[in-house]
Amino acid sequence: MFTALSNLVMRPCLLLLALGLSVSPDASALQRGGVPGASMRSILLASPSAPNRLGPRQLWIGRSTSAIVTSIATPAEAVPGFIPGVGGLALVLSIVVEETQEEELFTLFVPSTPPGVERPMLVAFHGFNVSHLDIWANTSFISECQARGWFLIAPYMRNLAPTGPGTSQSGFGSAQSQLHVQAVMRYVMEGFPVDLDRIYGVGFSMGGGAAMSYAARHRDRDEGAFAAVVNHTGTVALQHVYANADNDTQGLMRRIFGGNPQYAPFNYNRSSVIELDANGVLVPDGDHMARNLSEVPVRTYYGVGDGQGYLVDEALQLDGFMSTISSTHELVALPADCSPAQGGHCWGTIDETEVCDWLETKVLGTPGQIGQVLADRNARWGNLDVTSTLAGVFSSFDYSISSSQNSIRLLGSSNLESVRFNLNEVGLDRSSPIGLRLGTADGSGDTVHITGYGGAPSSIVRNGWLVIEDCSSASLPRWCYDPSTDTLSITETAPQTALWTVNP
């Protein structure tokens, strides 16, 4: 299906040495024996000296990997493409992901910058049938980050449903593999001074689709929402990918997503950003997770003459969809710069310096005042905490927040149990009446939880009628203020749109 780089199938002990690390031959014995090294954070941040001046030091990572940290800048040849004398550390690390209790490998570059100075971070997603070392071996993103003083992480994106040797590195951006990416990002963000407003994603082929999906599914700044994404011919519509895949890849995708697209459409669509039918046509009103990217700068590249023509079609369909919801999407066509064996489908089509120059101009903005949310799980989307009525089904709604009118609208909701937001975060003023317009598409009714209200309101009116406080669970329009959590809850149960006014 995709160009395979068999020389990059994971062989940790051999490849770690190339990056300046030496792994203990019996990490499990170290784990059983409880031999602790200094933590990575204490080694790299406790001293004012730059990381490139550190000598070999014992490093204990997670619970399963022990390594020796050495400088990669002296000699610079330790990592191809490194800039002599600039400094920095390239590491291959392993953590145990709490949600799955399984190991995740990743490449990390730590810039040689003063301790405590926040720096941007690039998250690079590898392609099909290769590992996290794809970024080191086939791109210059590590040296670009070295030159700019950026952090870089390249996760393995481990697939826990492999169908054979080597297939654990091909997860197609599944929700499970994204849990592993999220764990890696948390690990680095908690241990290093990452600028949360300048985290960027980039990916090629399967990795391009994974980068886009991760961006669309993670819009919480505190969890590492991407400020911008570069998608290089990504697998952005997985039902369409399945229709064009070979038998082995289809078997792997069935294992990952719990069946074929007809049997498990939700699992495919939650890891896609647009929904295409088998003929490559955009599904009207489909489950397009790209709705969540209306204010995120996205640049999509494809190579003219790329042998994976259906992925070029996906790039064009993505551009068409994004043009209807956003002015921040760019489509760039370039001559494919690949070896004959790669069939025009390779990292080499893009210029890493140009990519990073473009990313460098982007900063995560405040969540938009108008937009759509398509949620595949209970999570925070911008300033809104969303809880679904049913798991395994998308929740959706349109929202509009107006500080000048001191109002918020949540309309067209489907499979929505509740939305929670903080009054100050969304820019509403408690000292004036607050208007809420609530309406559902499925007629099920919703609850809005407003935190930080600062005391019970004097009165609340619904459609011109006074509503008395009711903290029961009756199936009636009602409101309740909880002083213990300073939360005002308003529940609308009617299928028609209702206007609520909260008086201070």
Give residue ranges: language-model regions.
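Mobile cap/lid helix-loop segments that gate and shape the active-site cleft of serine hydrolases
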Residues: 134, 226-290
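Alpha/beta-hydrolase active-site loop
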Residues: 171-192
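A domain-start/cap signature at the N-terminus of enzymes
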Residues: 30-119, 466-470, 476-480
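Primarily recognizes the serine-hydrolase "nucleophile elbow" in alpha/beta-hydrolase
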Residues: 130, 189-191, 196-248
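Short substrate-entry loop that stabilizes the transition state in hydrolases
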Residues: 114-119, 124-164, 239, 308
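Surface-exposed beta-strand/loop patches in extracellular or lumenal glycoproteins
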Residues: 414-456
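C-terminal beta-strand-rich structural cap/linker in extracellular carbohydrate-active enzymes
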Residues: 475-504
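C-terminal catalytic histidine-bearing segment of alpha/beta-hydrolase fold enzymes
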Residues: 299-301, 305-415
